Amino acid sequence: MVVRWHSHAPLEVVQADYAQMLAVAQAHGISDWLLDVRRRDKVSLELSAWVTEMFYPQATRHLAPRRLRMAVLNSPALTEVYVSDPDQKKYVDYVLDPARPFDISLFDDEGAAMRWLCPEIG
């Protein structure tokens, strides 16, 4: 499933979008997702906390036994935030930990993201 955000949105809108994404994924048995957030140059701590603490655990439960695999396509500015902001880095390190019951990887190249999601097309 490919989801692209073309602008910033309030947390409530993003939460509704994620709920819709999860509903579509459940209905169609989709556990490999590409999230394109290249047009965003910032992310709120509130959103990072919500996806980490609420959404990923919920998605993991609802998609089981399939494993959620999410390639996140970032802008260079957003990648810099993830690396330089200690609060954001905490959330990023948590979700990238291979011990989690889901797989998330960050990319700045869409081709690389698709190859990670679908190695058979690589």
Q: Can you annotate each of these PLM segments?
A:
Residues 1-122:
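Amphipathic, Lys/Arg-enriched alpha-helical "gate/interface" segment within cytosolic domains
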